[in-house]
């Protein structure tokens, strides 16, 4: 449903086509709020990948609607927020109770989102050697230097990406 063609989905469902959580996920990733709303109103299941897909696709309005309507989220949601590079979205997710883990810092480093990494660390987000590996893999020397200067660990795998 990344194409966002509501009438096609409606026709498919009226003619017995099955659906699952992927329908909501792809509608969210494509930013097709009307499709997502119709799917949910008609019993389509969703899961935490719907919220992650909304953020991965950069669709903050879709995320807000999904959360307001009970869609679950998890640590992958904050990781997905990093790909869009929108600090205010990450801040909103955290302020609204979205969990995070060391992948959040690693994804910020990989994408070169220095400000997001700094904010995450200043707000207690964990990190590990995957953060330094991701910075090196992404070619973000400034991020790597900052992470090391602030105590981020590394190991022999840091230079192996």
Stretches with model-predicted labels:
Residues 1-161:
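Ankyrin repeat (ANK) tandem alpha-helical domains that serve as protein-protein interaction scaffolds
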């Amino acid at each position: 449903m990344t194409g966002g063609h509501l009438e096609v989905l409606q026709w498919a469902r009226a003619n017995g086509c099955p659906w699952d959580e992927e329908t909501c996920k792809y509608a969210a990733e494509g930013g097709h709020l009307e499709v997502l709303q119709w799917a949910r109103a008609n019993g389509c299941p969703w899961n935490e990948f719907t919220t992650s897909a909304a953020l991965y696709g950069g669709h903050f309005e879709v995320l807000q609607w999904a959360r307001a309507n009970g869609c679950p989220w998890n640590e992958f949601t904050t990781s997905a927020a990093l790909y869009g590079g929108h600090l205010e979205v990450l801040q909103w997710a955290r302020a609204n109770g979205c969990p995070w883990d060391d992948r959040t810092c690693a994804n910020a480093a990989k994408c070169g989102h220095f400000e997001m990494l700094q904010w995450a660390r200043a707000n207690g987000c964990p990190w590990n050697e995957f953060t330094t590996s991701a910075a090196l893999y992404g070619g973000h020397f400034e991020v790597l230097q900052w992470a090391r200067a602030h105590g981020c660990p590394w190991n022999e795998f840091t230079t192996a990406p």
